[in-house]
Every structure is written in C-alpha cells, then in structure tokens.
C-alpha cells in the first residue's frame, strides 16, 4: 500500500508525428475566381490506445472545410499522433490526460500542418484559434453523465 502512495505521476513525450494528411480542392480552379467569403467548419476528434505498459498513442484528427455557398472550396484533414509515457494516474485523471492534455500538445502541430496545406493550395491564410480541450473534455463528461442518468430514469 505504501508503494502505491509513493508512486509519482510521470509524463513524457516519446514522439509526435503526422499520421495522415489530406487536402482536397474539388472546385478548383473556378473557386479562385469567386469572392473569398468562406464559411469555415472545424471538426475535432481524439482517439487513444495503449501500446504497452504506461505507453499510449493519442491521435488528434482535425478537419477543416471551407465552403463558398454550396461549393466546397477546400477540405483539409490532419491526423496528428503522439506517443506518450504516462504513469502514476488512473481513472478520470488518465482519461483527462489522454482526452485533453495530450490533444493540447498535439494541436499546434496539426494547426501548422493545416496552415501549410491551405497555403500550398494557394488559398488565403487560415489561422485556427486555440482550442480549449479541457472545456471540451468537461462537456464530454457531462454528456456521458447525462446519458447515464437518462438510462437509469428509463429503467
């Protein structure tokens, strides 16, 4: 028991890498002749898996779609991966680490990759605002708690 109480939390980044990237401009070149007033949609998703004892892969998927009216100007997707050594935490703390802390580390890399691809597609510069993954994680926990409550009420 005393060994468990003395276990310190350890966190180390082993590797950050681009797992998958995609850029499509399905309506080029005529989309370049239109007034550039796009509607930009940002979708985020995270996934994690345990690779070994205390070693986890976290993948942040960022998808940006820019539309002009009904036409898609571009669609850009990045899957930014990271391998992390994490020990000394469990349960909700581990879920927060994998679902919020690690994505916070990965997002700047994904954002830079998206900015580069959009620029190479000769579209105007796209600056993605920082994302509060802690707030997104808390919303996720609240949704999960709400769904659990609804299930108990139905029973």
Swiss-Prot record:
Its main location: cytoplasm. InterPro entries: SecB (IPR003708), SecB-like_sf (IPR035958). Pfam families: SecB. It is found in: Cytoplasm. One of its GO terms (cellular component) is cytosol. One of its GO terms (biological process) is protein localization. SUPFAM superfamilies: SecB-like. One of its GO terms (molecular function) is unfolded protein binding. Disruption phenotype: Growth continues, but export of its substrates is blocked. Expression of chaperones DnaK, GroEL/ES, ClpB, and HslU increases. One of the proteins required for the normal export of some preproteins out of the cell cytoplasm. It is a molecular chaperone that binds to a subset of precursor proteins, maintaining them in a translocation-competent state. For 2 proteins (MBP, MalE and PhoA) the substrate is wrapped around the homotetramer, which prevents it from folding. It also specifically binds to its receptor SecA. Its substrates include DegP, FhuA, FkpA, GBP, LamB, MalE (MBP), OmpA, OmpF, OmpT, OmpX, OppA, PhoE, TolB, TolC, YbgF, YcgK, YgiW and YncE. Belongs to the SecB family. Homotetramer, a dimer of dimers. One homotetramer interacts with 1 SecA dimer. This is Protein-export protein SecB. It comes from Escherichia coli (strain K12).
């Amino acid at each position: 028991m005393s060994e468990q109480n003395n276990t310190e939390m350890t966190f180390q980044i082993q590797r950050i890498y681009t797992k998958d990237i995609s850029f499509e401009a399905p309506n080029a070149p005529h989309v370049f002749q239109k007034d550039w007033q796009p509607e930009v949609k940002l979708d985020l998703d995270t996934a994690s898996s345990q690779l070994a004892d205390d070693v986890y892969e976290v993948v942040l998927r960022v998808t940006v779609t820019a539309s002009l009216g009904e036409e898609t100007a571009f669609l850009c997707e990045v899957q930014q991966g990271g391998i992390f050594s994490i020990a000394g935490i469990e349960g909700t703390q581990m879920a927060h680490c994998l679902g919020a802390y690690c994505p916070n580390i990965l997002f700047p890399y994904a954002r830079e990759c998206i900015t580069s691809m959009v620029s190479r597609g000769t579209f105007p510069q796209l600056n993605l605002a920082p994302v509060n993954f802690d707030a997104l994680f808390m919303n996720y926990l609240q949704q999960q708690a709400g769904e659990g409550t609804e299930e108990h009420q139905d029973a």
